[in-house]
Amino acid sequence: MLSSCSGNFSKKNESTNSVEASVEKSDIDVISESILSDSLNADLYVQRARLNLTNEKISLAIRDINSALSIDRKNIDALLVLADIYYALGDDNNILLTLNKACEYAPLDTRPIIKLSELSLLQGNFKMAGAYVDKALEMDKYNPKAYYMRGMLSMSSGDTLTALKNFMTSRMQQSDFVDPLIQIAHIYMAKNDTLAKSFFEEAMKVAPDNYYLVYDYAMYLQENGFPEKALSCYDSLLEAMPNNPDFNFNKGYVYLVYLGENELALECFDKVLQVNPSSVDALFNKGRTYEQMGDYINAKSIYLQILRNNPDYQLAIDAVNRIS
């Protein structure tokens, strides 16, 4: 439920999901064929429900989970996916009921307890979230997701040192768990510590196809002296999502600010404006590019165009005054 790998670029979910749908379609077909020959296998319905939920096909996911629970009403995996479905629907009450039911059916399984901790954290009930984490760790000290949640709770209170210790413990217990690696990288990035790069790279090895991670890594690279590597990351993202304006905008920004490649910057900002003509940021940076090229006529024309629709846009006001 808790999205620890939150992205910073807009309109990404729609594009990402379309890619995931094409990737997962064959997997869904395979599972569907297996269901035809083994229609009483609840786990198969759970697997297909997960894929449908990933692709935002909520009604299909619900149908599959209902099928799984009609076969085995105490199937914990089915109940956990059902809780995620309710989360997607914003139904906190049913999330709570479902997870409590899972705890009742499987009192030694820490997974529903961790999800209850996630729910409490999202609701701002930090004391309850901590109590659930403590309970999970009492049951099983080897619990990377519990330590990860403890780290997230520390982050919510601003205690990055304790958060870092818990994320490190989570990483030590499960080296292929990408979420704590990402949080560690962001903590070091906020401290301007060069260790951020090594943890981003470690996370990339674990989850090279995680678009949110690739984007965050690219942002780190461009801001820390590796513009060419940042461009490589944006290019890989654009291969998967060629119409995403944020990737082209960031490429343009790298060309403009870090590399001084004005013509390439203009190409990128124009691509953004083709997809999103109302992007003031892209239009302003196109003006900046012209200004940097010494083409003050085109630059001023763009700044004035911005001010006609956004008269309080201070950057454009300053730019016009600067040119004048």
Predicted segments, located by residue:
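Terminal, low-structured helical/coil segments at or just beyond the last alpha-helical repeat
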Residues: 8-16, 223, 232, 260, ...
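Alpha-helical adaptor scaffolds
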Residues: 118, 189, 219-223, 235-274
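Structural signature of tandem alpha-helical TPR/SEL1-like repeats
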Residues: 21-29, 55-67, 89-101, 123-135, ...
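N-terminal leader/linker segments that initiate helical-solenoid repeat arrays
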Residues: 4-66, 70-77, 88, 97, ...
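Helix-start (N-cap) detector for alpha-helical repeat units in TPR-like alpha-solenoids
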Residues: 42-43, 76-77, 110-111, 144-145, ...
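Structural marker of alpha-solenoid helical repeat scaffolds
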Residues: 37, 71, 105-106, 139, ...
